[in-house]
């Protein structure tokens, strides 16, 4: 039996496609169905390491990773066959079926579709053969008429799958009915027929006030409005496009007080931004995306996250004066955490003899040196911290699981080691700590997504992903028209 396909399309980026697809994955799974997510092509530096054919591992966009978890299935590379990871304003690294393709990366984007479409179609066909339902997510808008000829992610996928299309719009921005009608009208007739329902997202107020607009829209298009979704201020999932949402967000602690401020340096090519989502659920924690010294002032922690362009982001950091602010914070004994590219920045030097990322002096907070390597490390990792000292001692002995996505090898700085200045190996080959104990760098992404580590660091439990998925699935029953839900349950 070939799976039926539901496709979530949007009138724009940020309309709500990703989290609605996630909600539908859990809702269909709750019906006892085998469900898989799919997005033909994703553009994001938020990526996860998942299973690849032949027992290997590869990368997919984080949104499809979370959708797979919501669907109660193992995430794997077929769920996102093409991933574009921006490295500069006009250049992206191309990941095909989980692996970097240098050939496609060098190719002009308009010429790629003919090469990648067979992989997209094969991945989708395989998922359809193994599941009852495939929930497909589109990208941007399907009515970008300048891109339509090279489309591999929206209506070409919908046609290939014969998908039941839902077109979502953000009504909070204004002009929602014009966006829905305009998007529908710009599609060729055969593609219009695939749009089976309109969805109004981020609505505030009394839904009765929308009348008679949904009926008028149906008269013009033949498409019913099947759901009105209230504004979800904090739905509990990371933003798919890496938006710096909830700046200064605080979840009230005892008495509504702020106990800890964590400032994450938001450099231009930040990667894996989504791994900080759990911090928004820690009571009394204030999370700040910092782009200036003023925004790290008074922070208890400063975090240097991953980067897709480490040397360039380090240069940006210096240009903002953040290097001095971070050094002063560390000198006062404040906690500093570097993750992946952030770890590399904390060392003495970045050495690039292969033209991967560029040479640069580091921040000098750890006596380490990083040599960039064209070979990319992509793997899931389960390990445990050794004995840590000082501010990070709560992590001593804590077993963690996460993932590595990086270019580069980091080691003790030879000259400094000879002089007795050695970084303490918190996890051999993966994490190092300074002698004072307040600066920690690690290659492992996902520290804050590990419940045991989060409890050790903050003494708090946060809602599990399953609880978030279940709440979203209950929302489908609340927001969607009963007839639409009944038809989906009946297999139509």
Swiss-Prot record:
Entry keyword Nucleotide-binding: no
Top-rank taxon, per record: Bacteria
Domain GATase cobBQ-type: residue ranges: 259-453
Gene Ontology annotations of biological process type: cobalamin biosynthetic process
Key word Protein biosynthesis present: no
PROSITE patterns in the cross-refs: GATASE_COBBQ (PS51274)
Job of this protein: Catalyzes amidations at positions B, D, E, and G on adenosylcobyrinic A,C-diamide. NH(2) groups are provided by glutamine, and one molecule of ATP is hydrogenolyzed for each amidation.
UniProt name for this protein: Cobyric acid synthase
Gene name in the database record: cobQ
């Amino acid at each position: 039996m070939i799976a039926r396909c539901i496709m979530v399309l949007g009138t724009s980026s940020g309309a709500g496609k990703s989290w609605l697809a996630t909600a539908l994955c859990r809702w269909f799974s709750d019906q006892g169905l085998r469900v898989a997510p799919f997005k033909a092509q994703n553009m994001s530096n938020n990526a996860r390491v998942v299973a690849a054919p032949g027992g290997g591992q590869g990368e997919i966009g984080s949104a499809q990773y979370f959708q797979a978890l919501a669907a109660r299935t193992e995430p794997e590379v077929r769920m996102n066959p093409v991933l574009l990871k921006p490295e500069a304003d006009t250049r992206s690294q191309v990941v095909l079926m989980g692996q970097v393709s240098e050939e496609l990366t060098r190719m002009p984007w308009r010429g790629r579709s003919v090469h990648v479409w067979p992989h997209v179609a094969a991945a989708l066909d395989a998922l359809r053969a193994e599941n009852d339902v495939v929930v497909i997510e589109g990208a941007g808008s399907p009515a970008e008429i300048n891109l339509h000829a090279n489309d591999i992610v929206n209506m070409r996928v919908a046609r290939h799958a014969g998908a039941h299309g839902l077109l979502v719009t953000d009504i909070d921005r204004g002009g929602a009915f014009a966006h829905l009608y305009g998007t529908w009208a710009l599609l060729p007739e055969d593609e219009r027929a695939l749009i089976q329902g309109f969805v109004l997202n981020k609505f505030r107020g009394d839904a009765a006030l929308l009348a008679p607009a949904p009926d008028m829209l149906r008269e013009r298009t033949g498409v019913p409005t099947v759901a009105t979704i209230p504004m979800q201020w904090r739905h509990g999932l990371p933003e798919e496009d890496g938006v710096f949402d909830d700046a200064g967000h605080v979840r009230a602690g005892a008495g509504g007080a702020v106990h800890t401020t964590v400032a994450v340096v938001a450099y231009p090519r930040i990667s894996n931004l989504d791994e900080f989502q759990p911090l928004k659920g820690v009571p009394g924690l204030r999370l700040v995306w910092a782009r200036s010294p003023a925004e790290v002032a008074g922070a208890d922690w400063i975090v240097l996250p991953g980067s897709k362009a480490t040397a360039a982001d380090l240069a940006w950091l210096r240009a903002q004066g953040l290097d001095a602010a971070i050094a002063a914070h560390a000198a006062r004994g404040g906690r500093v955490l570097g993750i992946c590219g952030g770890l590399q920045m904390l060392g003495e030097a970045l050495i690039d003899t292969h033209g991967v990322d560029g040479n640069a002096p580091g921040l000098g907070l750890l006596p380490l040196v990083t040599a960039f390597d064209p070979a990319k490390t992509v793997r899931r990792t389960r390990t445990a911290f050794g004995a840590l000292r000082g501010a990070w001692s709560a992590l001593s002995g804590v077993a963690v699981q996460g993932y590595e996505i990086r270019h580069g090898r980091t080691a003790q700085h030879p000259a400094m080691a000879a002089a007795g200045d050695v970084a303490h190996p918190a996890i051999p080959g993966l994490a190092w700590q300074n002698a004072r104990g307040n600066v920690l760098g690690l290659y492992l992404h996902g520290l804050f997504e590990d419940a045991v580590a989060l409890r050790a660091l903050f003494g708090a439990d946060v809602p599990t992903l399953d609880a978030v998925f279940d709440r979203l699935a209950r929302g489908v029953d609340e927001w969607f028209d009963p007839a639409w839900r009944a038809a989906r349950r009946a297999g139509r």
